């Protein structure tokens, strides 16, 4: 089994017998569809401080060679609730994190460290998304709200 899938299993994903894994490319984006994986929710119902988020993310970001991690959304605006997810913008430039599987392992490791659901978008994906006229505002909002919670420099 590939190392990336082993990492999914390590973080609570369960392989269902006869599961299928589909992979395709669309507009130069590597798309992976996993049919038969489900992850049980074991989240912490609390509001983390920015410092706590930094402390939990740093070891994972360093392990993967991530350049920077930014917080946006309700946590960055100071509006987080106990059931809020954590929105992260990750700069993966200069890393080997190019496939959905490798990004998936990063996602799983960060989510495990935080013990809360996360939404993760890379800087390059944000740039691509912003090229669509209906999505320009999303990029502007993320860039305005973002708080640096990890910097490799």
Task: Identify the residue ranges that each predicted region occupies.
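Catalytic core of pol beta-like nucleotidyltransferases
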Residues: 25-68, 77-78, 82, 93-153
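A structural signal for short, well-ordered beta-strand segments
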Residues: 71, 86-88
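P-loop (Walker A) phosphate-binding loop of NTP-binding proteins
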Residues: 74
